[in-house]
């Protein structure tokens, strides 16, 4: 019984953290849209498109946490792994670790899953 409760709690913690991080990193996503401000006169470089796509992948991963946990974890890890090393600057490790916390909780939940 205890492992079932632990498993369920860890999954809910991961989902709630995903929602909170969706809003946190979503605000930065909206702010990064300013990179496209001069789109009409001069389109942004390819790297800007790639980084924005990686950021969007991260955000979609947070939303997928409510539907498909394994897909969510994959999207969160890919999005964070591509986005933060290039955009995070000297704090990239901290940003990346913060971003993948829901994935860590999902891994812990899967490890605590009761034997069937």
Give short role names for the model-derived ranges.
Residues 1-7:
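Short, Lys/Arg-rich, polar N-terminal cytosolic tail immediately upstream
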Residues 7-17, 23, 36-37, 93-116:
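Alpha-helical transmembrane segments and their immediate juxtamembrane flanks
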Residues 46-55, 94-99:
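Alpha-helical transmembrane segments of polytopic membrane proteins
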Residues 55-62, 76-84:
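Hydrophobic, membrane-inserted alpha-helices
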């Amino acid at each position: 019984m205890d492992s079932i409760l632990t498993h369920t709690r860890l999954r809910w913690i991961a989902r709630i953290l995903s929602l909170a991080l969706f809003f946190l990193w979503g605000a930065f996503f909206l702010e990064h849209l300013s990179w496209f401000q001069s789109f009409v006169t001069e389109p942004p470089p390819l790297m800007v498109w790639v980084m924005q796509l990686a950021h969007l992948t991260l955000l979609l991963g947070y939303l997928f946490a409510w539907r498909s946990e394994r897909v969510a974890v994959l999207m969160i890890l890919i999005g964070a792994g591509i986005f933060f090393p290039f955009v995070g600057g000297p704090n990239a490790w901290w940003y990346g670790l913060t971003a993948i916390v829901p994935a860590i909780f999902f891994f812990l939940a899967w490890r605590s899953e009761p034997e069937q």
